[in-house]
Amino acid sequence: MAVDVPQLVAQAREGRPRAVARLISLVEGASPQLREVMAELAPLTGGAYVIGLTGSPGVGKSTSTSALVSAYRRAGKRVGVLAVDPSSPFSGGALLGDRVRMSEHASDPGVYIRSMATRGHLGGLAWAAPQAIRVLDAAGCDVVLVETVGVGQSEVEIASQADTSVVLLAPGMGDGIQAAKAGILEIGDVYVVNKADRDGADATARELNHMLGLGESRGPGDWRPPIVKTVAARGEGIDEVVEALEKHRAWMEERGVLTERRVRRASHEVETIAVTALRERIGDLHGDRRLGALAERIVAGELDPYAAADQLVADITEA
């Protein structure tokens, strides 16, 4: 049954959590009304500061996210949290662990928490995450925190979806070397060494500082990622993280970097949507005689695969 999208958006703007949940469900489920939802949201976006948090499992991402929510709420900010969880290989459902970890915010009308499954997407972000960020932005969130699954070798996509990327590490986990391997040192705007009350925290911070220095080719006025030590479970160092985040935001706004990042993000989003649409069109051709005819010409040596692909793309774009 079709929903009244303008009314739903108006309710979301009023801060009604059910309306926000319904909009994200429409987005995540690729509803036939997806385009209508996006068109309605477009003029209402651009006000939220999007912060991405990533790091290996066990570094305390969810605890840190919860602590950041508390800090921003103390400052009177409305906060949205998008927790991207691994999909179950059997049910395809998100683990929803963040609901338990962030239960202290459950009754706060100024906080909206949502889980999204990665659905096997190697970048670590759910394919619908960019649209879900737009929903939270349009719903009046001042800050949107996007917490992703562990960094891994290919999970650096958060950098393309956030205004500021926070990389979390912890002592005794070999995170410094792992971060370098995963290319994380290239995407972090702020680095957090959590669980700083453990042995090895200072050494981890020094190692990270050394590695950042090795890869440094910054000029005067360029952003130099700070390293902040925290004990998120006790809220220690969280105010310093917020201070670092706000400094980075101010630096980006002053130099036009924030707009550049958002334009790049929108470009990536358009490209993803276009590629998905083309894949769907190509999938529709599997039973089409044109594809079979091209394949037969390749086998007969009359056509090479690249020329056939060019012909296929031309047919699709002209249709």
PLM regions: where:
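Nucleotide-state-sensitive switch-loop elements of NTP-binding domains
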Residues: V3-I51, S56-V59, S64-G176
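Short hinge/gating elements
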Residues: P6-V9, M116, Y191-V193, P226-V231, ...
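Generic secondary-structure signature for well-ordered alpha-helical cores
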Residues: E14, S25-P32, P43, R74, ...
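Generic beta-sheet signal
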Residues: L82, L168, V193-N194, T230
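Alpha-helical scaffold elements adjacent to nucleotide-binding pockets in ATP/GTP-utilizing enzyme cores
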Residues: L95, A132, E157, Q161, ...
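Flexible active-site lid/hinge loop adjacent to a nucleotide/diphosphate
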Residues: P171-D199
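Canonical P-loop GTPase G-domain recognition
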Residues: V190, A196-W251
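Long, well-ordered amphipathic alpha-helical subdomains in the mid-to-C-terminal portions
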Residues: K229, E240-T317
